[in-house]
Regions:
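N-terminal low-complexity, Pro/Thr/Ser-rich intrinsically disordered segments
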Residues: 1-4
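Secondary-structure boundary elements
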Residues: 17-21, 27-150, 186, 240-241
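Catalytic domains of carbohydrate-active enzymes that cleave complex glycans
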Residues: 6-10, 14-22, 28-63, 205-257
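Hydrophobic/aromatic-rich core segments of domains that either
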Residues: 106-107, 111-113, 117-119, 123-124, ...
Length: 257
């Protein structure tokens, strides 16, 4: 990922007209965000994503930014990278913003900070949506509505769900994980949200009214920096020299970290 706009349009091939339609029809105050999104989305999305989807995604993300105190304080860099994207890794593309905003904005609209909002969301959304953790989930990399339909998800699917709910209400959020703990006891995924700095939490694992507390803290503290096996990675659509190692697709190296 990571192209200039002209290169992205070339990669789009026969879908170029859809991207140009999105660029030409986006409101002026959203044009920088649309250009960033098209320049940074996965190459495979450039080839089949619709203008209608892009315009809706961009508009709803900006609406959430404008309607929340924390959203209005965000830099463009944080907003573009951790609120505007419609996906985290390789999960199915879904239109979740309207549904999640309508469901969960009323829950957090009076929160004093994004920190406080995320604490509330992590306590309530999984019961509200009827999703639990289970190793019997259909697949690891479920998109939100796939997890809702199944009623269950892995830590990966739960994290994707919490991140997308956070983004729907203007909270910068990102997918974090390790391919393998230092003691070879397994992998794990979790969520980081921005409130002046990055804070972590386990999806569907609330710890009272606090972030930065979890059962996996000690394991995470022993991760090996720079190791593609024992390291910790945060997914991003920014240009980087690293990729996010996905256990469910071990040979795919297209998502940045």
């Amino acid at each position: 990922m990571g192209n200039d706009l002209d290169s992205a349009l070339q990669i789009a091939g026969e879908n170029r007209s859809e991207l140009e339609k999105a660029i030409n029809n986006v409101p002026k105050d959203q044009s920088k965000g649309m250009a960033w999104l098209i320049s940074h989305m996965p190459d495979e999305d450039l080839k089949d994503i619709s203008a209608e989807f892009l315009l809706s995604n961009c508009d709803l993300a900006h609406e959430a930014r404008n309607n929340t105190s924390w959203g209005r304080e965000l830099s463009d860099e944080l907003f573009f990278t951790y609120v505007l994207p419609y996906a985290n890794l390789n999960e199915k593309i879904e239109s979740w913003r309207t549904d999640f905003y309508n469901k969960f904005y009323p829950m957090v609209k009076n929160a004093r900070s994004s920190y406080e909002a995320v604490v509330m969301l992590n306590k309530k959304i999984f019961d509200e949506l009827g999703v639990i953790y289970s190793t019997k989930r259909p697949k690891a990399d479920q998109a939100p509505y796939e997890s809702i339909a199944a009623g269950m998800a892995s830590c990966t699917g739960l994290s994707i769900l919490l991140i997308d709910v956070c983004r729907s209400v203007g909270i910068p959020a990102r997918f974090v994980g390790t391919p393998l703990w230092h003691n070879n006891s397994g992998n794990h995924s979790w969520v980081e949200i921005w409130d002046g700095e990055w804070h972590f939490t386990g999806a569907a694992e609330p710890t009272d009214d606090k972030l930065n507390q979890s059962w996996f803290q000690e394991l995470a503290s022993k991760a090996t920096e720079g190791s593609n096996t024992y390291g910790i990675f945060a997914a991003t659509w920014e240009d980087t020299d690293n990729y996010f190692p996905m256990n469910w697709l071990p040979n795919v190296k297209i998502h940045n970290a």
